[in-house]
Amino acid sequence: MPETAEFELTTQLAEFLRTHHFGKYRGLVTDVGDPEAIGRIKARVPAILGDELETPWAMPALPFAGPQHGLFLLPEVDDGVWIEFEGGDVSRPIWSGCWWARGQVPSPAGEKQRLLATSAGHQILIDEDADEIRVTHPGGGEFVIGASEITLKLGACELKITASEINLNNGMVKVTAAGASLVNDAFKIGA
């Protein structure tokens, strides 16, 4: 009798493992238009579903989330994502991160640089080597915060702020504790 129970248990375990999938699988995003707007995506996972079928809405696995706070970043259609299945159940997918193919890593990408880059070209770069935070707009605007200087650029205009002065367009306008000067000292207010 015990042999029958062991055989039955082994059969049940084999069936469970045949119908459940554990671990991470490469996927490609097919849809990000989540009707519930909670960060879900759909993806093709060829290793599990073949090349044509997509997952049901996959829940995100996020570093933090709560009522009206958290990190909300979605991949785009055709981006590579890692897909897992809750309890191994294919009907309950989770997207747990993204991956780049060779040549897809955005620049700059260094060991001490933390970059958030959108496909439209917007960037937030935290650069520990340069000791600065840089926000860049694809239209040319740039905002740089350094330890001793803050710079705002747009086209030919540049505003620099330091602990001792505010400088607009390389001295066209300067404001210091002593006063202000306009057009390279042609007009002064103060001492």
Predicted segments, located by residue:
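Hydrophobic packing positions characteristic
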Residues: 2-164
